[in-house]
Amino acid sequence: MPEHILSLSYGKDSMACLGAIERLGWPLDRIIHADVWATDTIPADPPPMVEFKKRADAIIKRRWGITVEHIRHRMTYEEMFYRPICRGPKKGVTKGFPLQKGNWCLKLKVSEKLSPKGSVSYIGIASDEPDRFHNLSVARKSPLVAAKWSEAMCRRWCEKNNLLSPVYTTATRSGCWFCNNQGVEQLRLLRKNYPEYWALLLKWDNDSPVTFKADGHTVHDFECRFQLEDEGLLAADDKVFRWEMLDAELNYRIF
């Protein structure tokens, strides 16, 4: 009989799979989560998510009797960042930030290990997400679809069972704090709430041959923008912000 494995992201849909599996009476052998570390001592998750995962793991162990397996890549983000390119015209050059095309994101690499050959994976696709149903197969099942649980129902289940991630109730980011796909608001909050992480991101920015954003903007560009906001020369909620504003000697938008 194949192993039945829940791939847990700690999001509401993924978490609610536990309730749907229980309701359906489906087998569940293992629960696996892909962990990424920024450095040897700094996790990729913001502190609120680190604490939530610990609490959720304890609840899951107590109620379902299964220990969540945290699988991580053998290398940290920082180690992969400074790893030299092995072949091609850029051989020997530091990799730097991941590209959107040819992304070396560690979470993507770890995720490949979450579905061992011959196993059945449970994934959190809600019943009201038909555009994602093409990801389902005999080996990849959604308990939520089978139980007819919508995204709203998943959230209510998580709230009722004290398993709702802080990403739904606070400004906590659900993902790596250093991800170059995050938006300006998340970067602004990172700089404000975790200056030590922001300082590390600035260091990496100095050492990367690849810009942080695909459009050519760097972490230092965002630092300059946020500094002007701190000084009252730019408004954080400016809907018509343009990067060329940073090049002006005086920002006339304050008048």
Predicted features by range, described:
Residues 1-255:
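Nucleotide-activated chemistry modules centered on ATP-dependent adenylation/adenylyltransferase
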